[in-house]
């Protein structure tokens, strides 16, 4: 295939991010309403479903074994296709077992894609351009999320689309983009051949520790921050939706700039700033009683997520270039260890005292 000017690895990463977001944002936006209205879920069933969703993330290290039989770029397309199919058919299985199965399929695609995307990003991007491009990928994903939310609002408010139709469109768009990428882009070669076995190196210990803490921080935010907004501060559905909208608008506008800043000041300073900021935000959550200030903390909490790209660029600088693929799977597994115990253990702490 004759390579055209737009057929670049960076553009492929952008389209991959859009495809993933079209499917995953649709699934996330519809989940709670669909499982309650159509599948009659209680807390028990939604807890099981969320646990099932995390299993593929915990098993992400197995991606390296699949790379023995399929190239990484093709594996990314296949993973996006699985994500798209899982979302597209979700509306046709309004039962506990049906949703458990479609969720697992969707999650396998999502977590394998995220694993391979990290590996490909660090292989294709130079050390100089990686922070800026990774920030722009977050911005593009946020813009795609805004498009999904706007479409969902119009589709349900004015055209009364069914759940089945919306799931089909969200997952189908991801599947179609996967096919377009497969047909429209050449196979990009990695400068360094990748090792196809599991690797744990002592000199990567700090990267593993940062990855684990990043997973713990993600669980605290995704599981408890929104719950706190509703239970303690009385936020309505529209209030929560407004917070989501503001978060994505900020990411769209500033994530690329944050990536540039990381490249300029370095990973050490960026992560130090993030963790100091998170310490202040988490401490303030325990003492703030005003709903508006709580919303400000929620937005700041989310904004700090963008600085986490410094963990990836730090690894890119210290790692053997041949370790990118194998370490990406190990890192995702480490990141999801926290998902096993934090929701349950911190949930029990919540029952004693939310301020703790």
Locations of the language-model features?
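Helix-to-loop junctions at the C-terminal end of transmembrane segments
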Residues: 60-72, 156, 254-267, 350-351
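C-terminal membrane-cytosol helix-exit motif in multi-pass small-molecule transporters
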Residues: 152, 171-190
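Glycine-rich segments within core transmembrane alpha-helices of 12-TM secondary carriers
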Residues: 134-150, 334-342
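A membrane-interface helix-boundary motif in multi-pass transporters
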Residues: 154-172, 348-356
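Short amphipathic helix-loop junctions that connect adjacent transmembrane helices
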Residues: 29-45, 223-240
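Loop-to-transmembrane helix entry/capping segments in MFS-fold secondary transporters
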Residues: 43-44, 127-137, 237-238, 321-331
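Structural signature of the two symmetry-related core transmembrane helices
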Residues: 75-88, 269-284
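Intracellular juxtamembrane helix-capping segments at the cytosolic ends
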Residues: 112-125, 306-319
């Amino acid at each position: 295939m004759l390579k055209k000017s737009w057929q670049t690895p960076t553009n492929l990463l952008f389209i991959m991010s859009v495809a993933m977001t079209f499917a995953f944002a649709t699934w996330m936006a519809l989940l709670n309403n669909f499982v309650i209205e159509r599948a009659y879920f209680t807390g028990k069933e939604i807890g099981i479903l969320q646990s099932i969703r995390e299993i593929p993330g915990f098993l992400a290290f197995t991606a390296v074994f699949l790379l023995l039989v399929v190239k990484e770029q093709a594996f990314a397309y296949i993973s996006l296709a699985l994500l798209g199919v899982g979302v597209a058919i979700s509306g046709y299985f309004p039962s506990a077992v049906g949703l458990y199965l479609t969720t697992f399929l969707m999650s396998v695609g999502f977590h394998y894609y995220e694993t391979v995307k990290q590996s490909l990003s660090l292989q294709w991007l130079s050390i100089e351009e990686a922070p800026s491009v990774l920030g722009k990928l977050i911005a593009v994903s946020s813009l795609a999320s805004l498009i999904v939310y706007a479409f969902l609002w119009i589709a349900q408010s004015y055209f009364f689309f069914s759940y089945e139709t919306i799931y089909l469109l969200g997952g189908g768009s991801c599947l179609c983009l996967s096919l377009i990428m497969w047909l429209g882009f050449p196979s990009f070669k990695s400068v360094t051949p990748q090792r196809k076995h599991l690797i744990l190196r002592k000199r990567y210990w700090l990267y593993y520790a940062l990855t684990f803490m990043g997973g713990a921080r993600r669980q605290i935010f995704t599981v408890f921050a929104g719950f706190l907004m509703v239970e303690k501060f009385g936020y309505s559905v529209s209030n929560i939706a407004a917070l989501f909208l503001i978060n994505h608008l900020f990411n769209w506008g500033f994530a690329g700039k944050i990536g540039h800043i990381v490249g300029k000041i370095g990973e050490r300073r960026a992560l130090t700033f993030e963790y100091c900021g998170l310490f202040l935000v988490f401490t303030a959550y325990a003492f703030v009683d005003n709903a508006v200030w709580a919303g400000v903390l929620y937005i700041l909490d989310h904004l700090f997520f963008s600085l986490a790209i410094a963990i990836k660029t730090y690894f890119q600088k210290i790692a053997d270039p041949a370790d990118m693929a194998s370490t990406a799977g190990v890192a995702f597994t480490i990141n999801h260890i926290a998902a096993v115990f934090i929701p349950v253990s911190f949930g029990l702490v919540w029952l004693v005292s939310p301020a703790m």
